[in-house]
């Protein structure tokens, strides 16, 4: 069974540390397809088991270049979503092709393993019957060799007419602070992504660290710098993207 196949098919493929990479200007634009699950119809451990059973196939898509990365994350704190499945590809066409490959509806050489365990699908659908799909465009970020076991996602509601200015503030004022924290080992990664398709959240800020305590300490330090007293850039950013919802996630599965 390929659970991502089933849930993407149900969603109609509306075109997810978390894992975001700094991009050079000439490099292809990286996109994230993220599915956020609301669960409660059964044991979440079973949903995690189903995803783990499919991890070899998903890892194969990374190995052959179909995907740049993918992952599965479990809720720790915040909000209503309880699980995330996500994958990334370089370029929108590549992202859409990856969706076809995951569903097993691509060209004649598409991976037949997508249908092998189809009977597991309804079990997952009963456990996590509702979901929200987003496509994000990676705008900025940095990562290290160390895997971030715990991540924070901040989903921003922004003034659409001024959200590009928020991107500029991130590039000019926030990125240097967060890049240094990655370099110093306080964070494993951070990222900034913009809305392409999906719900009402317009920007996604992520950071990951070795554990929850390290993550919260790094977050507090970063907030003090970028939103500290008399910080005009922080005040302007808040005026554009003030409303937000915070989540902390445990990284369950990941490959990049």
Residue ranges and their predicted role:
Residues 7-17:
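Bacterial N-terminal signal peptides
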Residues 22-256:
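Short S/T/G/P-rich N-terminal loop/turn motif that feeds into the first structured element of a domain
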Residues 1-6:
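Positively charged n-region of N-terminal signal peptides that target proteins for export
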């Amino acid at each position: 069974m390929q659970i991502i196949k089933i849930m993407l098919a149900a969603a109609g493929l509306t075109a997810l540390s978390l894992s975001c990479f700094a991009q050079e200007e000439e490099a292809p634009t990286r996109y994230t397809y993220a599915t956020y699950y609301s669960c409660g119809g059964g044991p979440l451990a079973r949903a995690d088991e189903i995803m783990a059973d499919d991890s070899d196939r998903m890892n194969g898509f990374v190995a052959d270049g179909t995907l740049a990365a993918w992952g599965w994350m479990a809720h720790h704190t915040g909000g209503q979503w309880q699980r995330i499945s996500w994958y990334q590809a370089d370029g929108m066409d590549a992202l859409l092709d990856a969706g076809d490959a995951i569903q097993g509806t691509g060209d004649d050489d598409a991976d037949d393993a997508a249908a092998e365990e189809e009977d597991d699908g309804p079990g997952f659908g009963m456990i996590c019957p509702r979901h929200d799909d987003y496509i994000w465009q990676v705008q900025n970020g940095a990562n290290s060799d160390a895997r971030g076991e715990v991540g924070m996602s901040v989903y921003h509601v922004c003034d659409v007419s001024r959200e590009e200015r928020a991107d500029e503030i991130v590039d000019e004022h926030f990125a240097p602070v967060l890049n240094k924290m990655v370099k110093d080992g306080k964070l494993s990664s951070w990222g900034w992504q913009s809305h392409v398709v999906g719900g009402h959240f317009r920007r996604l800020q992520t950071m990951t660290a070795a554990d929850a305590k390290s993550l919260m300490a790094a977050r507090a330090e970063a907030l003090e710098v970028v939103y500290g007293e008399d910080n005009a850039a922080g005040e302007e950013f808040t005026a554009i993207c003030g409303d937000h919802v915070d989540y902390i996630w445990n990284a369950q599965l990941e490959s990049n």
